[in-house]
Amino acid sequence: MSVYDKHQALSGLTLGKPTPYHDRYDAALLQPVPRSLNRDPLGIHPDSLPFHGADIWTLYELSWLNNRGVPQVAVGEMHLNAESLNLIESKSFKLYLNSFNQTTFDSWESVRATLANDLAHCAQGDVSITLFKLSELEGQPLAGFTGECIDDQDIQIDSYDFNADYLATNEQDAPVVEETLVSHLLKSNCLITHQPDWGSVQIHYRGKRINREALLRYIISFRHHNEFHEQCVERIFNDIMRYYQPEKLSVYARYTRRGGLDINPWRSNTAFNAPNGRLPRQ
């Protein structure tokens, strides 16, 4: 369980409540969640972030009317800088996008600029938006995380409660390595509704070798944990830094879509490329 799931800052969210749908443009539908809610308990301060990164969103259900009344459709890609004051609550994002459905825009650029302006205002941070025609995406192959998958270890799991102390199981004389580890067993739950969130996570680091059994147990322990996607990734980054102090660390998670949106946060303390390739479950 999160220590802040009843915080006053969350009380006004539409998430988990019956909500009418609007098909006329309304930027006020967007709702922010302060990043400080999970960062403060982790000791992460906005003036000295231990990482850089972004939340990459894919917008699959985006439509509007052109100036002749003909519906237009696109797939959108948003990159929200991790230095923003707020993350964007996903149900409100879905409702906001739905408000474009019967709204007329003069051009694709007008749609893109409107999205970028509204989302940056809500998040209080830098946002980039790209819109793709469906023909630009046809035939694209499924992607995969590079790295060694740790999921096939022959271990016994008896607890599914979050426990960062699994990472305390490390070798004092472990050699320094640089490697990339991958797990597809990340599952957490929405902070508010407790609906399941399914994801894959890639961890690239340089430092003392991470105990792979300990890491897998740690990842599986998120199974009953209630936090938003972005918060889980920052918790993973913070916990690995706390227990292993790697020289370099990058954590990238890609979650399955819900409500026409998928969220793919990454955090890193080094140069890192986060390709937005769709994984098999996405």
Curated annotation (Swiss-Prot):
User: What keywords appear on the UniProt entry?
Assistant: Cytoplasm, NADP, Oxidoreductase, Queuosine biosynthesis
What sort of enzyme, by top EC class, is this?
oxidoreductase
Cite a single GO MF annotation: preQ1 synthase activity
Catalyzed reaction equations: 7-aminomethyl-7-carbaguanine + 2 NADP(+) = 7-cyano-7-deazaguanine + 2 NADPH + 3 H(+)
- Which GO BP terms, alphabetically? queuosine biosynthetic process; tRNA modification
Q: What is its main location?
A: cytoplasm
NCBIfam families, A to Z: QueF
Function, in words: Catalyzes the NADPH-dependent reduction of 7-cyano-7-deazaguanine (preQ0) to 7-aminomethyl-7-deazaguanine (preQ1).
Quote the protein name from its UniProt record.
NADPH-dependent 7-cyano-7-deazaguanine reductase
Source species: Pectobacterium carotovorum subsp. carotovorum (strain PC1)
The organism's taxonomic lineage, starting at the top: Bacteria, Pseudomonadati, Pseudomonadota, Gammaproteobacteria, Enterobacterales
